[in-house]
């Protein structure tokens, strides 16, 4: 991975039943401090409701200036704190995809 290329991350969270609000609140605490990080360009939070709103998933779309900015993010106290709190509230591990641009603007 080129250190100077923008890094695009798509992370998906699937809460255990009855843990939707807790997961949502933990992720919400990440937004402001992450957006203040020098290398963060975008940190957007989304929700998907399926099966008559019974199944909910949350998704983060993140863009970092370069891989050093992503490394910095993953070493912050707010990142480490959120990871320690959220893991046991999820039905399965966080799905993290690092996207590589083929053709983008």
Predicted regions and their residues:
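Glycine-rich beta-strand-turn "strand-cap" elements at beta-sheet edges
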Residues: 1-5, 44-55, 84-105
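Short, well-ordered beta-strand segments in beta-rich or mixed alpha/beta enzyme
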Residues: 7-14, 44-74
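Short, surface-exposed ligand-recognition loops at beta-strand->loop->(often short) alpha-helix junctions
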Residues: 15-20
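Aromatic/hydrophobic pocket-lining residues that form π-stacking "cages" and hydrophobic walls in ligand
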Residues: 30
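An amphipathic, aromatic/His-enriched active-site/gating alpha helix that lines ligand/cofactor pockets
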Residues: 33-41, 63-97
């Amino acid at each position: 991975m080129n250190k100077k290329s923008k890094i695009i991350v798509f992370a998906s969270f699937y809460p255990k039943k009855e843990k939707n609000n807790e997961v949502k609140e933990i992720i919400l605490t990440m937004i402001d401090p992450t957006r203040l990080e020098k290398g963060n360009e975008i940190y957007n939070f989304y929700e998907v409701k399926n099966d008559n709103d019974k199944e909910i998933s949350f998704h983060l779309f993140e863009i970092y200036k370069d891989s050093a900015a992503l490394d910095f993010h993953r070493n912050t106290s707010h990142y480490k704190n959120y990871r320690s709190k959220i893991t046991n509230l999820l039905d399965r591990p966080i799905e993290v995809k690092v996207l590589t641009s083929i053709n983008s603007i």
